[in-house]
Swiss-Prot record:
Key word Lyase present: no
Quaternary organization: Homodimer which binds Holliday junction (HJ) DNA. The HJ becomes 2-fold symmetrical on binding to RuvC with unstacked arms; it has a different conformation from HJ DNA in complex with RuvA. In the full resolvosome a probable DNA-RuvA(4)-RuvB(12)-RuvC(2) complex forms which resolves the HJ.
Protein name per the record: Crossover junction endodeoxyribonuclease RuvC
GO cellular component, one term: cytoplasm
Cellular localisation: Cytoplasm
Annotated family: Belongs to the RuvC family.
Transmembrane residue ranges: none
Protein species of origin: Orientia tsutsugamushi (strain Boryong) (Rickettsia tsutsugamushi)
Length: 159
């Protein structure tokens, strides 16, 4: 079973692909979708949508998992994050792929064992659990952690 994990952002959306077989988690690939700062919001959202669609057609995931939004004091950044998530979710819906979302503290707890873990701890555990030797960004590790959380969550039934 292939799971695509997504750490949404208008600037740098992290993505990670894992496979689950015989209760083993295997790292397949990961990366970051970067947008151009001078582009309009519409162009940025269009680019994110297009790249997510390319990932879906390339990896054909059984399930997509995404980090939930938490509303912070900076209202405008929260709104743009929600818009990025909407663009991503519309692609997932178009392909009718099984979908789940997880709060950041639930993801941290699944990976590190503590909901208040630091980003570098998540990054280290992702690399350890998935036997990743290369350097990965925090956006990639967050996306892979989200995919991992989906793999251990009981909502996903392996057929």
């Amino acid at each position: 079973m292939i799971i695509l994990g997504i750490d949404p952002s208008l600037v740098s959306t992290g993505w990670g692909v894992i496979s689950i077989s015989d209760s083993m988690v295997n790292y397949i690939d990961s990366g970051v979708i970067k947008t151009v700062s001078k582009d309009s919001l519409v162009l940025k959202l269009g680019n994110i949508s297009l790249m997510i669609e390319k990932l879906i057609t390339r990896f054909n995931p059984f399930h997509v998992a995404m980090e939930e939004v938490f509303i912070n004091k900076n209202y405008s950044s929260s709104v743009t994050l929600i818009q990025a998530r909407g663009a991503i979710m519309s692609v997932i819906g178009r392909y009718n792929i099984d979908f789940s979302e997880y709060a950041p503290n639930k993801i941290k707890k699944a990976i590190v064992g503590a909901g208040k873990a630091e980003k570098h701890q998540v990054q280290q555990m992702v690399k350890l659990l998935m036997h990743i030797k290369k350097a990965i960004s925090k956006d990639e590790s967050d996306a892979l952690a989200t995919a991992y959380t989906a793999s251990v969550n009981q909502q996903i039934k392996i057929i």
